[in-house]
Every structure is written in structure tokens, then in C-alpha cells.
Regions:
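A polyanion-binding, active-site-adjacent surface
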Residues: 10-211
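Intrinsically disordered, low-complexity proline-rich regions
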Residues: 4-6
Length: 212
């Protein structure tokens, strides 16, 4: 990011623009199959952005992303890596998502994966967030989130690595993370466990992280 870009993104108007955007996200009713309300982590002005996949059934009730068991795992990773609590993460990282509303359940009882149309509709919010914040570091969490920024076949191809990506007219570093879902053993077994540790080390060493 150029110095001029950085100064624009950190201007006094950034917080106001972000507040306005978050209000629009929370009021969104564009996807008829989605279960509202939309979930937001709030207007946190930060150089670091996380991108989740979509809220689960608990998040709309509790009013914040990663509010249930997967969140406990996610925040536990950062407690181990740098001593951050859940409150630290929420206060210092802007929390975005591929889709902002709970997609509902499948007939089999699992969470429904957002369809391509829903992902495309919700992508307007991510574009606006990137334009306003000009993040230096983006952390996509889970396969669906990673695929919005990087094309890949296997998690082992991307976890534990840093990528330089241009999206919505802005260039930033991307360090992917696996989804912390309890239904997935990937991050608890090798090589996933070691690759996750490597990814977290890259994150806490990133130049944007200490100043968050």
C-alpha cells in the first residue's frame, strides 16, 4: 500500500464511513433464503481483517461472529500464539465474512453452504470494507473464505503460507487459517496441526499485527 493510500484509509472519516457501512450490513434483506438478522463484529477500524464463512445458528441470537464453540477454538489459537483474549481479538481485528446471515440447515441437519448467488450478493460488503479499511493483513478462515481470495485444491497448499493478493483495487497480505469447527479434525491432526502453528507464527510476526 502506498503512503497516500494508507493516509486516506486512516483519515478521520474512516470510522464514520465504517459505522455507516456496518449499519447497512445489519439492515440488509437482499437474500430471501437467508435467516436474518445479518451479523457484524462492529465498526472496528483496523489494519487487520478476518473473513469468516457465514454465521451459525447461535451467532444471530448473540449478535456477533464466532460467538459459539468454533469461536472459542479460534480465540484459543490466538491466546496460545500471542496472549490475546477473545475481547482483544474482537477489539483489534475487523471481522468480516463471506455471507453475513445464517444460511439455515440442510435436510441432513448440517449448516447449509451459501449458494453462489448469495456469495455474490454479499461480496459487495467485503468490497466496501476493503475500500474503506485498506487492510494490510487479511485472515480468511475456512475453505469458503480462502477461496474468495486464493484458488487452491487442498488446505495443505495454503495453510502456513503468506500470499500477496490484490482484491477490489487494493493489495494486501493474506494468511489463511483452517476453520475452527469442532466437526473438522483437520486442525487437530498432522500435518494440519503443524501448519496451523506455522500460520499463527506468520500472523503475529506480521508488521501490521503489533500495532493492531
Amino acid at each position: 500500500m502506498s503512503n497516500s493510500q494508507s493516509s486516506i484509509c486512516n483519515s478521520p472519516g474512516t470510522a464514520k464511513r465504517l459505522d455507516t457501512l456496518v449499519a447497512k450490513i445489519r439492515a440488509c434483506t437482499l437474500c430471501p433464503k437467508m435467516h436474518r438478522p445479518a451479523v457484524s463484529g462492529g465498526a472496528v477500524v483496523s489494519r487487520v481483517m478476518s473473513i469468516g464463512q457465514a454465521p451459525g445458528v447461535k451467532e444471530p441470537i448473540l449478535g456477533r461472529p464466532f460467538a459459539w464453540t468454533a469461536g472459542k477454538t479460534l480465540y484459543g489459537w490466538f491466546t496460545a500464539a500471542c496472549g490475546w483474549s477473545e475481547a482483544d481479538f474482537r477489539a483489534r481485528v475487523y471481522m468480516a465474512a463471506v455471507c453475513r446471515c445464517f444460511p439455515g440447515k440442510t435436510k441432513a441437519g448440517g449448516d447449509r453452504v451459501p449458494d453462489p448467488g448469495e456469495i455474490e450478493t454479499c461480496s459487495r460488503w467485503l468490497a466496501d470494507e476493503i475500500e474503506i479499511l485498506c487492510p494490510a493483513l487479511v485472515l480468511p478462515i475456512g475453505k469458503l473464505a480462502i477461496l474468495q481470495l486464493i484458488q487452491f485444491e487442498k488446505l495443505t497448499d495454503v495453510i502456513g503460507k503468506k500470499f500477496r493478493v490484490t482484491k477490489h483495487g487494493h493489495e494486501f497480505d493474506v494468511i489463511p487459517l483452517p476453520h475452527p469447527s469442532g466437526a473438522s479434525p483437520w486442525h487437530r491432526m498432522e500435518p494440519g496441526k503443524s501448519l496451523l502453528t506455522r500460520a499463527l507464527k506468520l500472523i503475529v510476526k506480521h508488521e501490521a499485527w503489533p500495532g493492531v
